[in-house]
Regions:
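Transmembrane helix-loop junctions at the membrane interface of multipass transporters and ion channels
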Residues: 553-576, 740-750, 771-781
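Extended, low-charge hydrophobic alpha-helical regions
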Residues: 354, 361-365, 381, 422-463, ...
Length: 781
């Protein structure tokens, strides 16, 4: 029997974990190991994926993946043991007893040396909140070279010569996701002086798996038990002193959200870093456990590779456990010769035979066995938390079989209505009024001062009009990210991925891709930016490439302009057809991408569903500031340059004389070269190609350009047939997004991908418009 067949509410014991490569390792790292008890919680509304409970936390996985996990001993779910309310157990302050700070007088690092810290932890454990408490307003966003995963660096408040780096949230140090590789590479290559490992105290078993792997890196380390206030409120506690003794590192109970225990955490972190007090325990395997097979294996590998590990500057215990798992990256770095590789495989095979488990499962089982012992000795189980009970009630509606999709549609409709119809639009209109007023004031001042006409035109027609039109979108983007951050931080976005995964998987994507593409209907720029949250590089790239096919709000003026001029009786029908046309083209391209550029092993949909929580006001505010600053820094500079270029081309002729008629400008000449390309589509007039070129700057400018060049709607209708108008609408729907969106794509994927988007979408738009014309001619339109 497999996990796929387990009825809802039933519990079973895992016997075999199937699969291979990244999929199987991901299962094991998430706690799906032989001899673990697993309970089926529910199915997604579409029947796939499923939610299961294992090691006291909830995970989601697809039915196809669940079918590779064999189970037996099916039984009714045991009722959780309830803890009794206890008082908080006191924790010794810095240096009390001297147990973990015995080097207080032994060779500290010089006061002038920079103390660097890596802040590491699982997703949804409060890491960002802790980082903000530690650094205040001193953080800034940077990038790892070659990897589009954000990190944050900041100085610990009140502590000079310190720098803490907030690493991506991960569940293990296995080299299968970009986040895991980034975190591991940072610690191994950048050599931080200390690690601050933040652990969700409400879910200790899940979090300690990463803790053990971090300890194996043999870097001075302190463990921050976050959300201890929630544990106490729900009747639980943690015997901190006993946990310190079991782990061999300082353990500090904190509440990052309430700023409790932060000063003590900082004191411990600085102390272990300054005196280089490394974890006292690196060995988690007992010689008496399961016949000592894993113990002998790991220690045998350590003796075998010790000199290679020292030469490669990799902690020997970490290298040994990774080799035992079958980590190819570590094997390559160590540079073992053939005899040593054969000896390594012999040691591992002997362990597998004695243990009765394969190498990866045996190592994962060893870790979870140790975690179980530590938790049994140190963790007093709380009552079922208020947050979990509340989440269960909310999930009955938000992930219910018949209510999930209507709720999702309603929530997203509300977000878009508030963003593009009420709050965002209102703020955008206010900013636009301010920009218009400022433009008029500057225009009058420059006229009064008799400023040179060329400079006057550059400032007013170029910079103010061009940059100002794009700057007015900032409130919409900030408002949209405000609502998205509320949904993300509350835990709802994880449910959206759970609900929509089956539908999106049919076109080669995962459920996580739904949000960026939905955002793309409002604006491509935040849609592309939102794709950063996707864990799979393949899915992230596909989502970014597909998002521009979702018709953004800036194209609405184009649709409204042409439908009013050519199809006034069928305006709504034409608009709906255009939106669905973009969706259909996106689906078609997803299928093509999945068969061509983005072949490969699908990333497993193994995801933890966090409890619903109210987002912190401070965190949301800081996120909005970061997004606003990010948009201005990335898009504003590109738009500024592009505005000046387009102004120059519109203002001068080939002899650099100021033109009085736009058809004599350099832009018109260039557009004249492009115009024949659109001849087969029915709109070969240079004025249309000019409008399309200016549309690259901002889609709204297509309408304003046509209005200026034609003078009236009647003149436009005389030149363009209804069929050609449909072809032009099709082209506008699908051709390259605006320069701000391309700048975002360049930021996320690089210049080659951005150029590919521009060229590829123009080609796709031309082909689609040509097919529309052929069909129109055939049906006599």
């Amino acid at each position: 029997m497999t996990l796929k067949d387990l009825p809802i509410g039933k519990t079973a014991t895992v016997t075999v974990v199937g699969g291979e490569g990244a999929l199987r390792q991901h299962f094991l790292d998430m706690g799906i190991i032989p001899m673990a008890d697993v309970t089926m919680v529910k199915y997604a509304p579409m029947g796939d994926p499923v939610e299961v409970r294992i090691h006291s936390y909830e995970l989601t996985l697809r039915l196809a993946d669940a079918a590779q996990i064999q189970i037996d001993n099916v039984r009714d779910e045991k009722e959780q043991k309830r803890g009794s309310r206890v008082r908080a157990i006191p924790h010794p302050g810095l240096g009390e007893g001297g147990k973990y700070h015995e080097k207080a007088d032994e060779h500290p690092l010089p006061d002038s040396e920079l103390l660097t810290f890596a802040l590491a932890g699982n997703q949804n454990c409060g890491k960002t909140t802790l980082f903000n408490q530690l650094t205040g307003s001193s953080q800034h966003v940077g990038n790892f070279p070659g990897v589009t995963v954000d990190r944050k660096d900041g100085i610990i408040r009140g502590k000079k010569n310190t720098l803490v780096t907030d690493l991506p949230g991960i569940y293990s140090m296995s080299p299968y996701t970009s986040e895991e590789i980034v975190t591991r590479s940072f610690i191994l290559e950048q050599h931080p002086k200390g690690i601050i490992n933040i652990v969700d105290a409400t879910n200790i078993e899940r979090n300690l798996y990463l803790t053990m792997q971090l300890m194996e890196l043999d870097v001075p380390m302190v463990l921050a038990l976050n959300m201890m206030d929630e544990v106490r409120q729900n009747g639980g506690s943690v015997r901190v002193n006993q946990m310190e003794e079991a782990l061999g590192i300082p353990v500090v109970p904190i509440s990052a959200a309430k700023n409790e225990g932060i000063d003590e955490l900082v004191a411990h972190a600085i102390h272990v870093a300054k005196y280089q007090e490394k974890p006292k325990r690196l060995d988690f395997c007992d010689a008496n456990d399961d016949g000592g097979a894993v113990h002998r294996c790991l220690h045998g590998i350590m003796h075998l590779i010790e000199d290679h590990a020292q030469q490669a500057d990799i902690p020997v215990r970490f290298a040994a456990s990774k080799l035992a798992e079958g980590d190819e990256l570590i094997l390559e770095k160590l540079g073992l010769d053939q005899n040593e590789k054969e000896t390594l495989e012999h040691i591992v095979k002997q362990m597998e035979t004695e243990r009765g488990l394969d190498r990866s499962a045996a190592i994962a089982h060893m870790r979870f066995d140790f975690i179980e012992k530590v938790c049994a000795e140190t963790v007093i189980k709380p009552h079922e938390s208020k947050e979990h009970l509340r989440s269960q009630k909310m999930d009955k509606i938000l992930t219910g079989k018949y209510t999930a999709i209507p709720c999702f549609a309603g929530i997203m409709a509300l977000v878009f209505w508030l963003t593009f119809g009420v709050i965002g639009k209102g703020l955008s209109d206010l900013l636009d009024m301010g920009i218009t007023w400022l433009t008029a004031v500057v225009d009058q001042a420059m006229t009064a001062w008799n400023v040179n006409n060329v400079l006057h035109s550059l400032v007013i027609d170029g910079i103010f009009n061009g940059v100002g039109s794009v700057l007015s979108f900032l409130p919409i983007i900030v408002t949209l990210f405000f609502f998205l951050s509320l949904l993300e931080d509350s835990g709802y976005m994880a449910r959206v991925a759970f609900v929509m995964d089956k539908l999106l998987r049919k076109i080669g994507l995962s459920g996580r891709s739904i949000v960026p593409m939905l955002v793309g209907f409002g604006c491509t720029v935040p849609g592309v930016m939102a794709s950063r949250t996707l864990p799979s590089e393949r899915d992230r790239k596909m989502t970014i490439l597909l998002t521009p096919f979702m018709s953004c709000s800036a194209k609405l003026p184009i649709y409204a302009f042409f439908t009013a001029a050519f199809f006034p009786k069928y305006g709504a029908l034409v608009m709906i057809a255009l939106y669905f046309g973009g969706i259909i083209m996106g689906i078609l391209m997803a299928l093509i991408f999945g068969k061509t550029m983005f072949k490969g092993e699908a990333v497993p949909f193994v995801m933890e569903l966090p409890n619903y929580r109210l987002p912190g006001v401070k965190n949301v505010g800081q996120l909005l500031w970061e997004k606003a600053k990010d948009f201005l820094q990335r898009a504003f500079t590109v738009i500024f340059v592009a505005t000046i270029v387009i102004w120059f081309l519109q203002t001068f002729d080939l002899h650099l004389n100021i033109v009085t008629d736009s058809k004599d400008s350099i832009l018109a000449v260039l557009a004249g070269f492009i115009a024949p390309i659109f001849g087969p589509l029915g709109f070969g007039d240079w004025r249309f190609s000019t409008a399309l070129v200016t549309g690259f700057m901002a889609k709204e400018s297509v309408v304003s350009t046509l209005s200026i060049l034609f003078g009236s709607t009647a003149a436009l209708v005389e030149v363009l047939s209804p069929l050609a108008a449909v072809c032009l609408l099709t082209f506008c729907l699908l051709y390259t997004p605006c320069v701000a969106a391309i700048a975002s794509v360049k930021r996320e994927l690089g210049g080659k991908w951005a150029a590919g988007v521009v060229i590829g979408q123009c080609v796709i738009a031309w082909i689609a418009a040509f097919l529309v014309k052929i069909v129109g001619v055939l049906i006599g339109f």
